[in-house]
Amino acid sequence: MKEKIQGDKELMINRYRRVAGLLLTVGMLLLALPLQAQKQPKEFTKWPTGSSPPEIGRRVAERLLEIPHSNFGRPGPPPFITYPEVATWYGALTFAQLSGDKDLDARLIKRFQPIFAEESNLIPVPDHVDRSVFGAVPLEIYIQTKEQKYLDLGKNSADKQWEDPTPDGLSSQTRYWIDDMYMIIILQLQAYRATGDSKYLDRAALEMTTYLDKLQQPNGLFYHAPDVPFYWGRGDGWVAAGMAEMLRSLPENHPRRAQIMESYRKMMKSLLQHQGKDGVWRQLIDHPDSWPETSSTGMFTFAMITGVKNGWLDKKTYAKAARKGWLGLITYLEPNADLRNVCQGTGKKNDLQYYLDRQRLTGDLHGQAPILWCASAFLR
């Protein structure tokens, strides 16, 4: 009897030790997390029925899998994978991973397999920012799977982009269009995230600070081009998203971080002043009478979510704006998960009416992509 009692005591002691060890481990992990990562802002919880980021993200990712490769809305297959599809595919992959949906992730990766075989003609020649950015997708798949063929394909695009740099160390693809502040940045960041090689990070940071010096206006916003004095929504959206992605990966002690952070906060402050009462930004940011545009709204919302979650922005102010942006954005979502009010592809033109008269598309991937970025950012 004494032996049984002694055995029971030892069993209980061992159980207590295991529980205590588990609690200690959990506590240490929580301490290792940034404070802002331990508690979601209340604005990022308790979503109205059908509006939560996991629900919306899954719908939009599934929609990508339903459609053929995009050709900028033109009939027939594209000559190569286009940059709006790259942005959407990247967002879908990050969403699938962050939401823990292994089946969705597997199907998104499977969608890529023909590109190594019968669809190899769709691999863009990496000789222009809009084509080079393709590499971000195989690099994301490599980050998730560690399969070498994805690294080789994606890294080739990143390396080609700096094959013949300028005397200042910039990519020869530099052209000072604000779109580049996402296109160049995300490719080089993905190469850094995949390899850990800081040369890719330094390239992205140099490129971004050079663009900031040249293009950011005193109010924190960006003209579509230096000779086109209009704050076109999606153009600025690419910048906002690019800075948010840059700051996610840039170490605190990086010499270019302070400048990028200052420019980012300056832009966010200005955007806050121009957000519509419905949560949606306008086709021309500072023209409240211009039409509500959804791709820019998604991009600005992504940048604000990322800033709040990482503690770069005042939580009380910007969490409210980000929630408002998300809920305003998804009111434009069709039952099949196509987004309405997406500005068509737009080249620069020094003509106000030109921007106001741009077509409003439904289901264009320029709009689908930032929904997935937002859903991913909420889950990080």
What does each model-identified segment do?
Residues 35-37:
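Boundary at the C-terminal end of the N-terminal hydrophobic targeting segment
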Residues 1-17:
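N-terminal secretory signal peptides that target proteins for export/translocation
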Residues 151-182:
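Asp-box/WD-like beta-propeller blade repeats and closely related beta-sheet repeat scaffolds
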Residues 69, 100, 116-121, 146, ...:
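Helix-capping and short linker residues that terminate individual alpha-solenoid repeat units
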